[in-house]
From Swiss-Prot:
Function noted in UniProt: Usually encoded in the trnK tRNA gene intron. Probably assists in splicing its own and other chloroplast group II introns.
Lineage, highest ranks first: Eukaryota, Viridiplantae, Streptophyta, Embryophyta, Tracheophyta
UniProt similarity note: Belongs to the intron maturase 2 family. MatK subfamily.
GO biological process: mRNA processing; RNA splicing; tRNA processing
Protein name listed in UniProt: Maturase K
Amino acid sequence: MEKFQGYLEFDGARQQSFLYPLFFREYIYVLAYDHGLNRLNKNRSIFLENADYDKKYSSLIVKRIILRMYEQNRLIIPTTDLHKNLGHTNLFYYQMISVLFAVIVEIPFSLRLGSSFEGKQLKKSYNLQSIHSIFPFLEDKLSHFNYVLDVLIPYPIHLEVLVQTLRYRVKDASSLHFFRFCLYEYCNWKNFDIQKKCILNPRFLLFLYNSHICEYESIFFFLRKRSSHLRSTAYEVFFERILFYGKIQNFLKVFVNNFPAMLGLFKDPFLHYVRYHGKSILATKDTPLLMNKWKFYFVNLWQCYFSVWFQSQKVNINQLSKDNLEFLGYLSSLRLNPLVVRSQMLENSFLIDNIRIKLDSKIPISSIIGSLAKDKFCNVLGHPISKATWTDSSDSDILNRFVRICRNISHYYSGSSKKKNLYRINYILRLCCVKTLARKHKSTVRAFLKRLGSGLLEEFLTGEDQVLSLIFPRSYYASKRLYRVRIWYLDILYLNDLVNNE
């Protein structure tokens, strides 16, 4: 990027519309090619020559597409000619344009992000290698909250919504018109069902989604900073947010004439927001009435501002002391542990009954069994079955596959306080492995285990089982108290695929 910094510096009069000319500059294509932003798959780049040429960067293809962009009518393909032009390079050109959009449209965001960090020292964090770094945040914060809003973020159903979202951040009308033109031409291809594979670059689609979410969250944070409500210190009167700013301006008049009780403008700082995989949670200590207000804020925001049909059923209000919160593959809830503390002052002693609130992470056994049943490891009731598609592999390969899945799930859910459900999942995978091997050798499970012995199942021992057997005595290791031990594995770099399946 530093190599091309000189090309990207424009005077003040042109900074509002400098993106569109970049589509006609060859060095931008070189920039995209050098940074590897144009990958359709792991081994092929769309800025390479066609099959008839050497697989090198082609300036000839770049010159051709620039010439076609000067004459946009040549990029438009009538629906009657879609089948006839399928073998030509029009689809290839649209792939290149989507790659170029992914590079060019990110330039103002990158420059703005770099300028925001100037003169600031970034805080170093040494706990970014594990997804489990989020769980201390949940344990420290959620234990003080009462309610959680579980929001399913909707996707825009119309392309014009995406164009309008970018319009607030990209002040280049020419680029937006060209962007709208390419999107509608892409829909023309997609709706005609010629190419089943998406012709747009995944990086470009990810940028569109992130810009859409960024616009939504910026409005939400704006409302969050300015959200307040009027209430009396004696909790006798509660005011709605009708004509809220008028109430603020005439606050003294309202206080003196209409309400004899002491009033205060209350601003709740205990509001935490987390977003993950198209879902977001909003935790707070507010009352149920205020939680319903936030719920309708979200519904009206998506319907009125983003023109997206958003049903109120997609926003669930959960009470942490009663309901479970599904997040990161866990079912989290608050567990109340009564604790009696004896305190003595001189000659008098007191018994104080305290309640300790602790975040409890449970294993969603139903969803995991559903994922295993979907992948043919068991049936919908959780009874193990043989994996017929793996019988062509070698015995060691089959065993290694099952052991890898079993250990991944065991490591991921090792932080749960109750592991009975985890032991059930391990049992399903172990018996499924034995049934698969027995089916391959055309034998019964009993005869197969009798021939190989119990040493086969020792491969399924996880690192947790081995460590606990060395730390705790055998009597404690065999007791029922062991399943409450919480051990987090901090070497997991990605989520297990079975956790994300629905």
